[in-house]
Amino acid sequence: VHNPYSTPGGWGFSDVNTMNPDVDDTTAALRAIRQAAAKETALRHAWDRANQWLFSMQNDDGGFAAFEKNVSSRFWRYLPIEGAEFLLMDPSTADLTGRTLEYFGTFAGLTKDQRAVSRAVDWLLSHQERNGSWYGRWGICYIYGTWAAITGLTAVGVPAHHPALQKAVRWLLSIQNDDGGWGESCKSDGAKTYVPLGDSTPVHTAWALDALVAAAERPTPEMKAGFRALFRLLHHPDWTASYPVGQGMADAFYIHYHSYRYIFPLLALAHYEQKFGPLDD
């Protein structure tokens, strides 16, 4: 609606939604077709159109939102509508901006030297929390946002020794549980501050590990403890395996994505082995 002059080219949330594309699902689809698009003309056209649409969705502030462009007026917050901030606004967020940067760097071969990418990097760096974390709008919550930001920034060439990344790493390590894993309560998004769950979840642990791997120059004891915790959680699943880590509206609507407990641990382990070799512990 707010980007009417762009050529359609995105993908939507679900296999039957062809009317409402969003940034995150578009980058997910582009990741999936990248190799085939290099060989098949029809897919190459889809790849090109989707990338053009993706760039057209960058907000004026440099970040990326989910469904709309430049819908971030604070006016909506003052309407007497419960949840107006989540229902009527679609501002730039750390999770969408970070995941888009990760796509640009890892799958599209772009770096922070490109202007659009540089603007997104600047937006992320200017929206880091004082404690080093980032708030994630569509997941739970600060672990999720910090994972998206770290992996996005490193993918486009921000060095691991950058002060913002090292501050984020220190924050992640400061909230690591005694069992080696990570877990965050859904209460975080309503409180607008990190609230520990009290137990580790496989998804939060995988997100934290993936972020640490991206920002590390070598394996660390904390990283290996995290993988040991992750393997325990996967081999002996309990209630934490189905704890919701997706968010629709703070304090009201949460989502359990059944595939997350498999996808993100696999990604974290694959990224570790690609960077450091086989996990020897």
Tell me the role of every PLM-derived stretch.
Residues 1-281:
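Preference for long, amphipathic alpha-helical scaffolds in soluble/luminal domains
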